[in-house]
């Protein structure tokens, strides 16, 4: 089996999304800001509309998803904020290698949107740019849709999901709207909000640190929470998966393995003084505003000064959360987050952004 991915419209800007030291909070029903004003970052929000889900991040990039029959396929409509943005429509499904063809067709209420496959993997194809908005509106108003001949798509909830995006981005009654277009010009759509700025701390030599043959300092071993993790993993290979890094001349980072499952490994992270002294749990915020010291499938990249994590919802990695936090010299700031809550076969490259920074 391989995943066939079909793409239409303009490619979006990079999907990285994440908050600063603290994730944003606020009223999830906040109205879109007026055009011509300086726009503040908005709260990241996820909504369910019958069979569809919709997500908008703190930069107001928005994504809507619907499932294909059998849970082996999906369709996505994505659009950046601002009057100049145009939607992207993507669809994918699992198919046997022998069944893959050089083209595929998205059909909505009898209207065909041919797509020619590219050579990359997963296989991708594009509807011509000039038909992307047409296809998105057809999904919003349609009764039946399918990919190829055999993959029926649910449109139950599509209209509500796309209307919510129109409202969130201030597109209602404009020529750019997905669900409720009108005569107002694109210039009346609010400008994108300003994204938080995160500046990494200077790089630091890493001699003696890393993810191989690291010995946890005594000051960390003495912590009750660490002792609990060590007891949990005492008879497991993951007990040796201690990681460390130098953050600056007086600050170190240590990761303690706490559990291992079939496809997920958990660590708790601590910021310490030299030699592991004075340990305190790292604060790793999420786009929802919650924070913890733990990661799943985490690691530290010293050249970027980032902790990354990829919490899989299941083994094939088609759902879950992918996060990045950057060390600023004072704390770890959330800089990117992608989260796909439904296990519909969506590859991470097509997951919705839930937080972005610059």
Can you say where each PLM-predicted feature lies in the sequence?
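Bacterial N-terminal signal peptides
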Residues: 5-13
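A generic "folded-domain core" signal
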Residues: 15-232, 244, 265
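Short, solvent-exposed coil/turn segments at beta-strand boundaries
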Residues: 83-84, 108-110, 141-142, 247-252, ...
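Signature of short aromatic-glycine-proline-rich micro-motifs recurring in repeat-based ectodomains
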Residues: 230-243, 296-299
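Exposed beta-strand-loop-beta-strand "reactive/processing" segments of non-cytosolic proteins
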Residues: 242-262, 267
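Structural motif
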Residues: 262-270, 317-323
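Short aromatic loop motif centered on NTY/YTY
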Residues: 280-358
């Amino acid at each position: 089996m391989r995943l066939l991915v079909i793409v239409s419209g303009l490619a979006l800007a990079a999907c990285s999304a994440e908050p600063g030291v603290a994730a944003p909070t606020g009223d999830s029903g906040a109205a879109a800001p007026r055009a011509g004003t300086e726009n503040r970052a908005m709260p990241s929000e996820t909504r369910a509309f019958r069979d569809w889900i919709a997500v908008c991040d703190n930069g107001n990039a928005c994504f809507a998803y619907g499932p294909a029959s059998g849970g082996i396929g999906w369709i996505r409509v994505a659009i950046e904020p601002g009057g100049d943005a145009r939607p992207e429509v993507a669809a994918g499904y699992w198919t046997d290698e022998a069944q893959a063809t050089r083209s595929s067709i998205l059909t909505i209420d009898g209207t065909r949107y041919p797509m020619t496959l590219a050579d990359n993997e997963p296989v991708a194809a594009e509807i011509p740019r000039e038909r992307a908005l047409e296809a998105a509106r057809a999904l919003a108003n349609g009764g039946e849709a399918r990919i190829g001949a055999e993959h029926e798509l649910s449109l139950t909830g599509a209209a509500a999901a796309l209307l919510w995006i129109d409202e969130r981005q201030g597109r209602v009654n404009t020529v750019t709207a997905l669900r409720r277009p009108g005569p107002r010009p694109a210039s009346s759509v609010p400008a994108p909000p300003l994204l938080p700025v995160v500046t990494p701390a200077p790089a630091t030599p890493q001699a003696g640190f890393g993810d191989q043959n690291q010995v946890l300092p005594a000051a960390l071993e003495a912590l009750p929470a660490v002792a609990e993790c060590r007891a949990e993993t005492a008879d497991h290979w993951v007990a040796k998966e201690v990681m460390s890094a130098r953050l600056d001349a007086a600050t170190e980072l240590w990761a303690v393995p706490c559990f291992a499952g079939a496809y997920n490994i958990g660590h708790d992270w601590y910021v310490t003084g030299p030699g592991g002294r004075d340990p305190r749990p790292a604060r790793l915020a999420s786009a929802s505003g919650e924070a913890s010291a733990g990661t799943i499938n985490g690691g530290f990249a010293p050249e970027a000064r980032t902790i990354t994590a990829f919490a899989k919802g299941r083994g094939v990695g088609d759902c879950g959360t992918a996060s990045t936090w950057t060390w600023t010299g004072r704390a770890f700031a959330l800089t990117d987050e992608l989260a796909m809550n439904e296990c519909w076969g969506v590859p991470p490259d097509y997951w919705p952004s839930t937080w972005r920074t610059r």
